Amino acid sequence: MSRNLVHYDIVGSFLRPAELKQARADFAAKKISKDDLKKVEDEEIKKLVAKEEKAGLKIVTDGEFRRSYWHLDTFWGFGGIKHTKQEHGYFFHDEETRNDSAQVEGKIEFTGDHPDLEAFKYLKSITDSSDVTLRQSIPSPAQFYAELVRGPENVTAVKKFYSNEDELLDDISKAYRDLILALYDAGCRDVKLDDCTWGMVVDDDFWATMVKQGFDRDDLEKKYLRVNNGALVDLPDDLRVSTHICRGNYHSTWAAKGGYGPVAKYVFAQENVDAFYLEFDNKRSGSFDPIKEVPAGKEVVLGLVTSKKPELEKPDDLITRVKEAAQFHDLQDLALSTQCGFASTEEGNQLTEEEQWKKIALVIDTAKQIWA
């Protein structure tokens, strides 16, 4: 087990700067080349990392500036996967996402040109002299599985190449393990698995809408646990692996509701990660009680500061809530963060860059008061 001894943290995505948004629009319109876009990405990532360090963050990311989505870009980077469109996107509260998806077109495998590996290599190249930990966030294996069976067309595509789900789950786990080990070989010591599957499966209405049929929660939970843990077998001891369990974060809206209780006995008690990043920024998130299932010694990062709204939480309220959480998990194994990233997709949440950094400052300053 590898630990992070800093009690303030981030989830990882940041609002895309205007220059980057314009470059992506120009690339989509075929006004600039892929190399031109990459130059803008490189420069904006350099600026972001400098801001992260100046803010006092000890764990930094590239803001996911090269991605359109928090999850699909990673999926498209695996061998055997193609970029497709569905009739609908994901249904959020009062809003629907774009309708991109990922579909099987062959056996799934990791390849050495995966975009997340290339992204990390660049991040490392600009931070070699810095006293910070570099994090690479990737969507979880369970999230990949959920996308590949989302809707009848995706399911039909899977069946062309996989005769049973065991084989599919095994290939997903192996592709992910290969990606994680490649990141490690490139110098990464902090990998975070972003995972909406657990946050969605607690909400009967959401998942039934997405799959257009009923579902067996217990069966899904077993599959999610199996495919995630399958990717985490025999990893290096000095690699910290965490997971962020989300209920959806798109343009300041949410997708699912419900506390972590129904999934705690699986994900908290049995998933082989070092830390859990959990959303607790509103009443939809439920109580702290389920975190008692997290084994002693593992970290729980409390997402008490919302990334969806610009209004700043009161430090005293945050301190009170951390103390409440400490009734269920040791205070020294707790930390504070925003509830999610600021831009899980390139659209971003509805706040300004200045407001984003004020949120980060609030997290850091409050954590320093609690864990002085």
Predicted features, each with a name:
Residues 1-372:
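Domain-level signal for soluble alpha/beta catalytic cores
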